Amino acid sequence: MSKKGQTNHWKGEISMKKILILNGGPRMHNNTAKLLAAAGEGAVSAGASTETIDLYKLNFTDCRSCLACKNKRMAVPWKCYWRDGLTETLQKVYEADAIIIGSPIFFGEPTGVVRSFMVRSTFPALSYDDYQSTFPGKIDVAVILTMNADQNYYDKHYKSHMEEYFQPFHYLNGKTEILTSFDTLQVPDYSRYRMASWDEAKKKAHHAEQFPKDLQAAFELGRRLASRQ
């Protein structure tokens, strides 16, 4: 059997890359979801297979600190042993060549489900013997972030924090990169909400000009992940 994404010399074939797409936002059809869909289209265009999972539809918790993943009697030290609604998705993570996870920014942070997923998928691979990874494979990770903040605010207040925030994905032994979408359109009609601080006309004009560019950037991200050796 060939390894993921590598040539099967016995058959002379190349196995199809698997890319798992995870929506960490509560809306299934808004900015984050649209960018993830574009990334998936880019991956498929490069010959990869994709699957999309909405994390908000799963019933799971953050790490329970059971430390089963650190127990020497356990056969697979890099797997989370706590079984709940995330278990099946984690198995798909372990089998993927890359994952693309998207999240809006709430109060300067990704959503709670994204944080919980990140810990559950990476903490088991962290060895407390030498602080190296016990995971035997390599999974590249792309993070797509959407936010009301503009790029200047992000660069000043969020950028370095987000780069540090997603460091745990390095325990999956692949590359981690972040794609950002700024000043997003929250709702189609701002007059229905207590959002007077936002200029609806300005928001819509920015969205009409910028969001197609963001979708293209997401498409190229997916294509690049699927093409990476």
Give the location of each predicted region:
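Short, catalytically relevant binding-site loops at active-site mouths
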Residues: 106-108, 149-150, 185
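Short aromatic-enriched loop/helix-cap "lid" or pocket-rim segments at secondary-structure transitions
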Residues: 63-66, 155-156, 188-193
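N-terminal beta1-alpha1-beta2 submodule of the flavodoxin-like/Rossmannoid cofactor-binding fold
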Residues: 3-130, 195-229
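Beta-strand-loop-alpha "switch" segments that mediate conformational coupling across diverse proteins
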Residues: 177-188
